[in-house]
């Protein structure tokens, strides 16, 4: 069975953070947008980040001043547009004189404070770790430290919210739908793309679009070569980053940034109240399918953490791990840690005769919005009369908080729904912001939310995730739309799988 979709201005391939951001920006400008994703939203690298919105302090050592400046500016923008998903976080950097001298750290932090616009976060400052709570959890031998501010984010939810906003601006969103083929064509109106799509049920669709955006992440080179029909000159470097989750290593709300003898840095970040997230590694990979952490990486992270922590961690303390492969533009660097994290665009037009295709290499979650603006700027000659950029001051769904910010929203929710479990209300507030009000509705008792799956996840939220956020499997719900899978028993995860499958079966098939 096959169907023909309406004509589009923009076909976006890939619903990671880059594709989601471009689809949102384009749809908000009034363009007709189709975004397709072979799996689930954020199912690739975007869900496996260190979960930070940051300027990239370490990139200063690699002289990536443009990237750091843009990242610092975008950090402020993302804090405003998704205040329920992004929150300020203070980082403590213990001084290790044999690794980097104090003057170098002060100079780097001075640049970090002044390179980009800072509206909400404080400047860096020095602290005495042995005599203040800033050193909580560290060995008493550490004396001097430096504190600076960045932010943390629920990475997968940020992607989902961008796709939701694209849909609110009339974008056509197709998950579990692969691009089978795409070829250039012409008619009286000019060049365009003719694409064939196939969903997981085997149903094919034909779509046409003026331009194509290849935001396929690790598959970007494959897609580019397939649609152009010739080998790509540019190469991609696959670099695996792995993280471990352990029980909370200190009671403070701050994070640690740890220096290692190999000149790399690793973060220890408070995670979901009960845990600490430790990462990341940088390992060059030949492939990128189903990455997994190695024992060597686990030991690397544990050994570095134990260099600093007063209470050493053992292998048995690791409760969960995750790995993602970053699709970085090959800039010729031999060291995986030195490869640029900046984004690179490649525009193909069949020597100016055919429809345009823009391929996206690299990029960071922090700069996704600016990447989207730059992508549409490059495509402007192929999309005449495109309206002006608009996302800098626009909040994402759920981000329209009251004047008192997230604290006021949480107070309003806990007061109105005082008879509901606090874990449920807090979780909905953090994941959905003001949209939590519509999910909770008139609920007066726990039974009004349907089945309870533990970890603050209820049937009412799952129904919303399936109906409004394209969740189709238990994995979509437990690890991307929420992070409730961590700490949930296998029996309850199985219950979630069964419930989602039952609810998703009732959804109408897209036209």
Model-derived features: positions:
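Beta1/beta-strand and adjacent pyrophosphate-binding region of the FAD-binding site
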Residues: 4-18
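Core beta-strand elements of the Rossmann-like FAD/NAD(P) dinucleotide-binding domain
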Residues: 6-8, 201-211
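Glycine-rich FAD pyrophosphate-binding loop
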Residues: 27-48
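Dinucleotide-binding Rossmann-like beta1-alpha1 core, especially the glycine-rich loop
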Residues: 51-135
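C-terminal catalytic lobe of FAD-dependent flavoproteins
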Residues: 141, 149, 155-158, 165, ...
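A conserved short coil-to-beta-strand element within the FAD-binding core of flavoproteins
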Residues: 175-193
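Flavin (primarily FAD) binding-site architecture
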Residues: 214-229
């Amino acid at each position: 069975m096959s169907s023909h979709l309406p004509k589009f201005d923009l076909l976006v391939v890939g619903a990671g953070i880059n594709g989601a951001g471009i689809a949102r920006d384009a749809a908000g400008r009034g363009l007709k947008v189709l975004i397709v994703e072979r799996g689930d939203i954020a199912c690739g690298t975007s869900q496996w980040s260190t979960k930070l919105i940051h300027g990239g302090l370490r990139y200063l050592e690699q002289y990536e001043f443009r990237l750091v400046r843009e990242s610092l500016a975008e950090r402020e923008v993302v804090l405003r547009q998704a205040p329920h998903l992004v929150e300020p976080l203070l980082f403590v950097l213990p001084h290790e004189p044999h690794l980097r001298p104090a003057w170098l750290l002060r100079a780097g932090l001075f640049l970090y404070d002044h390179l980009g616009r800072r509206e909400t976060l404080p400047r860096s400052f020095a602290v005495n770790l042995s005599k203040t709570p800033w050193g909580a959890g560290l060995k008493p031998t550490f004396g001097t430290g430096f504190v600076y501010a960045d932010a943390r984010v629920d990475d997968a939810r940020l992607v989902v919210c961008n796709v939701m906003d694209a849909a609110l601006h009339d974008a056509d969103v197709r998950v579990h739908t692969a691009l089978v083929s795409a070829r250039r064509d012409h008619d009286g109106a000019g060049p365009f793309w003719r694409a064939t799509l196939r969903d997981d049920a085997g149903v094919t669709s034909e779509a046409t679009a003026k331009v194509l955006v290849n935001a396929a992440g690790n598959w970007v080179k494959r897609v580019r070569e397939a649609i152009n029909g010739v080998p790509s000159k540019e190469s991609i470097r696959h670099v695996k980053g792995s993280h471990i989750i352990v029980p909370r290593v200190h009671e403070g709300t701050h994070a640690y940034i740890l220096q290692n003898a190999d000149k790399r840095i690793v973060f220890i970040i408070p995670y979901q109240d009960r845990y600490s997230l430790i990462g990341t590694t940088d390992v060059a990979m030949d492939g990128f399918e189903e990455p997994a952490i190695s024992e060597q990486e686990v030991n690397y992270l544990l050994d570095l953490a134990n260099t600093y922590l007063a209470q050493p961690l053992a292998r048995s303390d690791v409760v969960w791990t995750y790995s993602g492969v970053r699709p970085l533009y090959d800039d010729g660097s031999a060291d995986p840690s030195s490869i640029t994290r900046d984004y690179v665009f490649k525009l193909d037009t069949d020597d100016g005769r055919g429809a345009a295709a823009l391929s996206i290499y690299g990029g960071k979650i922090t700069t996704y919005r600016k990447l989207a603006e730059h992508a549409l700027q490059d495509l402007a000659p192929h999309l005449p009369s495109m309206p002006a950029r608009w996302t800098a001051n626009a909040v994402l769904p759920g981000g329209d908080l009251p004047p008192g910010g997230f604290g006021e929203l949480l107070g309003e929710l806990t007061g109105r729904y005082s008879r509901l479990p606090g874990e449920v209300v807090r979780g909905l507030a953090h994941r959905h912001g003001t949209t939590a009000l519509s999910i909770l509705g008139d609920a007066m008792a726990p039974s009004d939310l349907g089945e309870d799956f533990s970890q603050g996840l209820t049937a009412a939220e799952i129904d919303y995730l399936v109906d409004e956020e394209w969740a189709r499997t238990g994995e979509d719900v437990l690890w991307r739309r929420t992070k409730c899978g961590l700490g949930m028993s296998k029996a309850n995860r199985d219950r979630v799988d069964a419930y989602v499958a039952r609810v998703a079966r009732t959804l109408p098939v897209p036209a």
